[in-house]
Amino acid sequence: VKPKKTRFTLEPMQWMVPASPQEYVKILQDVDREGFAVHMDAINFIKDPYTYTHKRELLDETFELLGSQTRSCHLKDCILESGTTVAIKEVPLGEGTMEIPYYLEKIAALDEDTPVLLEHLPDMEAYDRAIDWLKKQSLWR
């Protein structure tokens, strides 16, 4: 198969490969095909207190390693729940602590046709609220 416009990507997850930007680079090198690219979901690289509290560093490293091969992105938010066990929870856009403006700045440097997708919201009203939040933050272009 030699796709001309389509790319096969994997969504990173905290609990499966690729679970880090470095693992994604390794997979890209191992597969070594032009048709294999990156789906960016930086929130899914947040898996422990360190990556949670160093999000800008994580974004810098992630886009440095994977930006040139990124073909699509997820946009979402997260919080670290209080308690003795680490629990990073996905929350609606604007209700968490993700560096959304910085993340969008990084995404804006990608190809202008790169799609940015919201996901895991419970209903259309939640998607509308997320878009409204982006507009109020002057982050919608």
Go through each PLM region and give its residues.
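Hydrophobic, aromatic-enriched interface-forming segments
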Residues: 4-24
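Histidine-acidic metal/acid-base catalytic patches
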Residues: 18-141
